[in-house]
Amino acid sequence: MTRTLQAVANPFADLDLDRLRRRTSAKWRYYPEDALPLWVAEMDADIAPPIIAAVTDALELGDTGYALGHACARAMAGFAVDHWGWTFDPDATANVTDVMTGIVDLVRLVSPADEAIVLTPPVYPPFYGVAKKLGRTVVPARLGPDDRLDSASLEAAFAEATAGGRGAVLLLSNPHNPTGTVHSRAELDEVARLARHHGVRVISDEIHAPLIMPTSTFVPYLAASDTGPDLAVASASKGWNLAGFKAAVIIPGADAGPDLEPLRQPGGGHPGHIGLIAHAAAWADGGPWLDAAIAGIDANRHALADLLREHLPAARYTPPESTYLAWIDCRALGLGDDPAAAFLERGRVALSSGIPFGDGGAGHVRLNLATSPAILADAVARMASAHTTTAA
């Protein structure tokens, strides 16, 4: 079904930095006020009006009890059909507190304690935290030089992880954080083929799936071939800036439904009712706002290329195909393995260090594009000042 959507203005076009500094979330409170924060994945935009309305209505009604049902998954299912041409059964899903909680639960449920976790570095640092929390060995399958999944690397990692007849789990970032790569259907088909051959279960983190740039097409992992034993975890958290309203949905492959039964029982780690209301409103009615946000991010990702070309021409950067995260190779700037530290100390701009992303992360930074053009320009100017100070 195609919905008629009303245009919304770019939510990043005109942001008041003083107003942003009144926020008390991690992005704006972790570093001192003289540092410009473009690190953690929070947007600087205001929340989409349909979400504000849905949450306000619930609060005014006193609808603040326990969560029940699959309304959020049903709203997501409508979005998935409209935007990705993909269908899934919302009644087969399970609600969880957030994506990472869901991933920890799934690894425990589908994988014995002695099995390894395969990761595709450089990749989202909390994936390593899952392995540490559960006492698992990490087997890396490094991305290729083009920042895409590498079939040979996956084949070798799967073989190593499953040596001796064990199984293993692949934590897939789809689309990929931090590079913003959107995996193609052919690439996902190959992941599934290799996983089936080696007895690997795939858990796909699709939290950034709503944030696909106009030149790319997102393919849900479970839409690929032969993904029956696998699972995906999705959330409106990143697409609509709802990290403070925790909620996520686990979607099982065709054969994985029984694995979710323990998560449906009372007493588990379920999301709050208001969080599910906020996320359902995002999936169902947040499309126009999301389109405007993507247009703003699209403009910023290209503006960053121009700014770096002007102020830091030795930095290497390819505009991401998705997310609002820019992965910048700073190795030629002479700032060492952790250029984020130099940018913070000498330029007072806070970026994410590439080191925690694992293999291939040293010498890189991750920059948050979900801000105003003026703040983005200020950030690059601060980076350039830090580089000049270091060179001197």
How does the language model describe each region?
Residues 2-98, 105, 284, 392:
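N-terminal small-domain helix-loop-helix segment of the aminotransferase-like
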Residues 223-298, 387-388:
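Conserved core segment of the aminotransferase class I/II
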Residues 108-168, 172:
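PLP-dependent aminotransferase-like
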Residues 134, 197-198, 228, 347:
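Helix C-cap/helix->beta junction micro-motif
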Residues 145-217:
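Active-site phosphate-binding strand-loop segment of PLP-dependent enzymes
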Residues 280, 297-305, 317-330:
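Conserved glycine-rich beta-strand-loop-beta hairpin in the small C-terminal domain of fold type I
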Residues 78, 338, 342-351, 357-392:
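PLP-dependent enzyme catalytic core of the Aspartate aminotransferase-like
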Residues 38, 55, 76, 93, ...:
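Generic structural signal for small/hydrophobic residues in well-ordered secondary structure
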